Curated annotation (Swiss-Prot):
<comment type="pathway">
    <text>Antibiotic biosynthesis; tetracenomycin C biosynthesis.</text>
</comment>
<dbReference type="GO" id="GO:0017000">
    <property type="term" value="P:antibiotic biosynthetic process"/>
</dbReference>
<dbReference type="Pfam" id="PF04072">
    <property type="entry name" value="LCM"/>
</dbReference>
<dbReference type="InterPro" id="IPR016874">
    <property type="entry name" value="TcmP-like"/>
</dbReference>
<keyword id="KW-0808">Transferase</keyword>
<dbReference type="InterPro" id="IPR007213">
    <property type="entry name" value="Ppm1/Ppm2/Tcmp"/>
</dbReference>
<dbReference type="GO" id="GO:0032259">
    <property type="term" value="P:methylation"/>
</dbReference>
<protein>
    <recommendedName>
        <fullName>Tetracenomycin polyketide synthesis O-methyltransferase TcmP</fullName>
        <ecNumber>2.1.1.-</ecNumber>
    </recommendedName>
</protein>
<dbReference type="GO" id="GO:0008168">
    <property type="term" value="F:methyltransferase activity"/>
</dbReference>
<dbReference type="InterPro" id="IPR029063">
    <property type="entry name" value="SAM-dependent_MTases_sf"/>
</dbReference>
<keyword id="KW-0045">Antibiotic biosynthesis</keyword>
<keyword id="KW-0489">Methyltransferase</keyword>
<comment type="function">
    <text>Catalyzes as well the following side reactions: methylation of 8-O-methyl-TCM D3 to 9-carboxymethyl-8-O-methyl-TCM D3; and of TCM B3 to 9-carboxymethyl-TCM B3.</text>
</comment>
């Protein structure tokens, strides 16, 4: 019998992300090659037909994860003594699939129910630990080192937050940490009106609450944050492996900024 899942709402969406990475691993040329995701899929007792993942969703998830892995790898190559905060980590295997220096302290953070599930699915390892807490609360930062460069990664988190909560979370994290980088995915504000048509959001009851327009607007609302770059999933070189119609649609969307950057990655330093 598999591990029983008791997650609802936004926390249930992590299972769709897991399914997307597992499906990618079965492709002739995987984007991420996350064999752990496929193993976890077999171990979990859950009706995945509720959140059936379409090919386009699989591509978004894996393009996003691959680019975040690349950005994180570049940061850790320069800062092998860093502390990594993976916020709303879900069941992601980033701490295990990346080539992480032994000197890095990696901390996965998510709500207690998710961390309890992770503790049953993932092994213990030196330099790795988990914190069970909502990332929008304050106390969990008390045990995070303040004397090391920090990498903050949030994947599939910010669109589900309220704007005030998301900005305060960033302010709190940056006040606590000395220097480093923040990288996360974000949606444009116009997408919030259409999120209700998402099959995944309808199935789980989750909602979108925060869209970020001009990435530089966060610099004035989160002191110390400095915008570096944005990257659209439509710019992934792996889109070349898509079906002809998907490549044609992608090319058309790339020519319109409001579509190209509707869902993209943002990278900041502080």
């Amino acid at each position: 019998m598999g591990e029983t899942i008791r997650l609802t709402g936004v926390h249930e969406t992590l299972l769709a992300t897991l399914q997307a990475r597992a499906l990618d691993n079965r492709q002739p040329r995987p984007v991420l090659g996350d064999a752990t995701a496929e193993e976890l899929l077999r171990r979990i007792d859950y009706d995945f037909s509720r959140i059936r993942t379409a090919t386009k969703d699989m591509r978004i998830v894996t393009f996003r994860a691959r680019k975040l892995d690349e950005w994180a790898g570049r940061f850790l190559a320069v800062h092998p003594d860093a502390v990594v905060l993976h916020l709303a980590c879900g069941l992601d295997s980033r701490a295990f699939r990346m080539d992480v220096p032994d000197t890095v302290e990696w901390i996965d953070v998510d709500v207690p129910d998710v961390i309890e599930l992770r503790s049953r699915l993932y092994p213990e390892r030196d330099g790795y630990r988990m914190i069970g807490a909502s990332v929008t609360t304050e106390d969990w930062l008390d045990t995070v080192p303040r004397n090391r460069p920090a990498l903050v990664v949030a994947e599939g988190l910010t669109p589900y937050l309220r704007e005030a909560d998301g900005e305060e979370m960033l302010r709190r994290v940056i006040r606590h940490l000395p220097t480093g980088a923040v990288m996360f995915d974000a949606v444009l504000p116009w997408t919030l009106r259409f999120a209700k048509y998402s099959q995944l959001l309808r199935a789980t009851g989750a909602t979108f609450g925060w869209g970020i327009g001009n990435p530089r607007s966060l610099e004035s609302r989160v002191p110390g944050l400095r915008f570096q770059e944005q990257w659209s999933m439509l710019d992934s070189p792996f889109l070349a492996d898509a079906r002809p119609v998907e490549k044609w649609v992608g090319a058309g969307m790339r020519s319109i900024p409001q579509l190209r950057f509707a869902h993209r990655l943002l990278r900041y330093t502080f």
